[in-house]
Curated annotation (Swiss-Prot):
Keywords, in A-Z order: Cytoplasm, NADP, Oxidoreductase, Queuosine biosynthesis
Species in which this protein is naturally found: Chlorobium luteolum (strain DSM 273 / BCRC 81028 / 2530)
Pfam hit, one: QueF
Domain of life: Bacteria
Name by which UniProt lists this protein: NADPH-dependent 7-cyano-7-deazaguanine reductase
Length: 116
């Protein structure tokens, strides 16, 4: 997962609070215990400050996880950390919803608030 893949562009409306929601319904990674693929939906919601996340670079960033052995919780926190590092949003929430494995689903949500 190469953070340097991520790109941003200038926010044309930095004086206005507005929410951007990005959904990736086809996210994949690998279970570090079993080596089997994990499938999930990643939702990123954020209020930008000076920059916005460029979507093509985000797509390629997400593809970096495809062969990575990483737990759900770590995926979610890593994505938040990397996106906050490159875009410095006013606030951001990353929610990952994972398909059933053994009849159990999991959802992980993590947030960042710049004013906190």
């Amino acid at each position: 997962m190469k953070q340097e893949i991520l790109e941003v562009f200038d926010n044309t409306y930095p004086d206005r609070d507005y929410t951007i929601e990005i959904v990736n319904p086809e996210f994949t990674s690998v279970c570090p215990k079993t080596g089997l693929p994990d499938f999930g939906t990643i939702t990123v919601s954020y209020i930008p400050d000076k920059t916005c996340i460029e979507l093509k670079s985000l797509k390629y960033y997400f593809l970096e996880f495809r062969n990575a052995g990483i737990f759900y919780e770590n995926v979610t926190n890593r994505i938040l950390d990397d996106l906050v590092a490159v875009s410095s949003p006013r606030s951001m929430t990353v929610r990952t919803e994972w398909k059933a494995r053994g009849g159990i689903t999991e959802t992980v949500t993590v947030s960042h608030n710049a004013s906190a």
